[in-house]
């Protein structure tokens, strides 16, 4: 059973928690995150039978998401996020999901604004790794999705260390992209990235802290970008939309729907 686990915390801008400017534009593009989460679950179900995949939402203790079709969403409630900003909340929630959540099988931890464009089972069955992390242009981690194939003592230690790396950064530098930079700092430390050298990232399988870490390209047969990005792989399993790129979201959704319908 594959577990798709997006993180979503509904932001109350009157809660007194400081956020970077980027977060203040959270809902300025597209249809809104409730819509994206509903479509994300819908596209997952196109490609996976009920016994193959399950959809959860990792969140704080109060956020609710209403389904516009199908059953209620299964919420994974993470304590202690009320006084945390969005990126810190996401990082803490991801750590909890990978290390403690009561779910079995591979975990695909993601954001909200995604489209599933294929069945993950064959790739997971045929690919040897413990954790998969995307690298954009072999330079920067993009955690549109982080995949944990199996939970072990080593993977728990890895994600705890990643959380330590997050808190080693100054609050201002981790408030936006800190969730991604914490992975990058591990890559710098392990020699998978070289500071000041673009394109230095090493794709493929690496051993870090006893874990088989698979570095995959952001833009490829697993994780494709949006339709007007530098890459567009029609058969990629998963698509990511960020910021003003959401204006092309419905085009990508229609393409994914057509591809799925053509397989029926």
Region locations from a protein language model:
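Short loop/helix-cap segments at secondary-structure boundaries that form the rim of catalytic
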Residues: 63-71, 122-127, 225-228
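GT-A fold catalytic core of metal-dependent nucleotide-sugar glycosyltransferases
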Residues: 75, 82, 86-140, 146-156
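Catalytic core and acceptor-binding pocket of nucleotide-sugar-dependent glycosyltransferases
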Residues: 153-261
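A generic structural signal for well-ordered coil/turn residues at beta-strand boundaries
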Residues: 141-142, 230
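N-terminal anchoring/stem segment of glycosyltransferases
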Residues: 1-85, 99-104, 153, 262-264
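Short, polar loop motifs at secondary-structure junctions
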Residues: 58-65, 116-121, 219-222
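Short, hydrophobic beta-strand segments that form beta-sheet elements in well-ordered domains
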Residues: 52-61, 106-108, 113, 131-132, ...
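A structural signal for well-ordered alpha-helical segments within the folded catalytic domains
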Residues: 38-41, 88, 92, 177-185
């Amino acid at each position: 059973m594959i577990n798709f686990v997006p993180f979503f915390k509904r932001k109350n801008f009157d809660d007194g928690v400081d956020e970077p400017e980027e977060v203040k534009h959270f809902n300025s593009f597209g249809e809104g995150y409730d819509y994206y989460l509903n479509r994300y679950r819908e596209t997952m179900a196109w490609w996976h039978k009920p016994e193959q995949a399950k959809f959860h939402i990792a969140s704080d203790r109060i956020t609710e998401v209403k389904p516009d079709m199908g059953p209620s969403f299964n919420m994974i409630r993470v304590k202690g996020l009320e006084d945390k900003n969005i990126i810190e909340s996401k990082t803490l929630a991801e750590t909890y999901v990978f290390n403690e959540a009561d779910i079995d099988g591979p975990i695909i931890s993601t954001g909200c604004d995604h489209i599933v464009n294929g069945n993950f089972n064959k790739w997971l069955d045929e690919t040897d790794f413990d954790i998969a992390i995307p690298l954009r242009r072999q330079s920067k981690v993009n955690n549109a999705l982080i995949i944990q194939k199996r939970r072990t003592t080593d993977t728990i230690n890895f994600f705890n260390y990643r959380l330590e790396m997050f808190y080693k950064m100054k609050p201002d530098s981790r408030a936006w992209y800190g969730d991604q930079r914490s992975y990058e700092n591990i890559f710098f430390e392990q020699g998978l990235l070289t500071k000041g050298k673009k394109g230095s990232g090493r794709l493929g399988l690496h051993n870090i802290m006893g874990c088989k870490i698979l570095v995959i390209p952001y833009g490829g047969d697993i994780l494709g970008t949006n339709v007007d990005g530098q890459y567009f792989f029609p058969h990629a399993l998963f698509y990511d939309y960020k910021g003003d790129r959401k204006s092309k979201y419905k085009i990508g959704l229609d393409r994914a729907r057509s591809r799925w319908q053509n397989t029926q």
